[in-house]
A protein has these predicted regions:
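Active-site beta->alpha N-cap acidic-glycine motif
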Residues: 1-69
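Catalytic domains of cell-wall/extracellular-matrix polysaccharide-remodeling enzymes
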Residues: 101-132
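Short, solvent-exposed beta-strand-terminating loops
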Residues: 69-88
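A short alpha-helix capping/helix-coil boundary motif
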Residues: 2-5, 36-40, 95-98, 119-124
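Short, mixed-charge, low-aromatic patches
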Residues: 14-19, 72-75, 96-100
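Conserved, mostly hydrophobic/aromatic
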Residues: 11, 73, 131
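Active-site gating loops and adjacent loop-to-helix segments of metal-dependent hydrolytic enzymes
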Residues: 84-105
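Short hydrophobic/aromatic-rich motifs at helix boundaries and adjacent loops
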Residues: 30-33, 88-91, 112-115
Length: 132
């Protein structure tokens, strides 16, 4: 019989979302060592720069030390591109989600945002092995 395992992924991690996640993370921590992947948004919806909250950044650093993984999850996690022009684009960008940040970006802008997120992780000393 194979050993059982569990991987837990926390979506849209930012100082703004931490009050919702905190009780859940504390409950999971009480169960023992459950590895978590935190999908970190550097500036959630353009209103919540991660590095403006040093306490939260230190929390993420402690989680890395504990063995959790941080993954870059966009930069703003918000679709701020010009309005959609076709029914298909409208569905994908307004009905399905307003958070498809990279859906309408050109290569250069997508690369700029990814580079900014990668640089934030580098400054904080957080290993980065993925982007979701």
């Amino acid at each position: 019989m194979a050993e059982r395992s569990l991987l837990l992924v926390l979506h849209d991690v930012a100082p703004e979302t931490w009050p919702d996640y905190r009780p859940f993370v504390e409950a999971v921590d009480a169960l023992g060592e459950v590895p978590m992947t935190w999908l970190v948004v550097p500036d959630f919806h353009h209103r919540n720069p991660l590095e403006a909250d040093e306490k939260f950044c230190k929390l993420l650093s402690r989680r890395v030390t504990r063995g959790d993984e941080l993954a870059l999850h966009g930069f703003y996690h918000y679709d701020d591109a010009p309005p959609p022009r076709t029914p298909g684009q409208y569905f994908m960008r307004r009905i399905y989600t307003w958070e498809g940040e990279f859906y309408a970006l050109d290569h250069a802008e997508a690369k700029t945002r990814l580079a900014a997120g990668i640089e934030l992780f580098r400054r904080r000393g957080w290993p980065l092995h993925g982007f979701v």
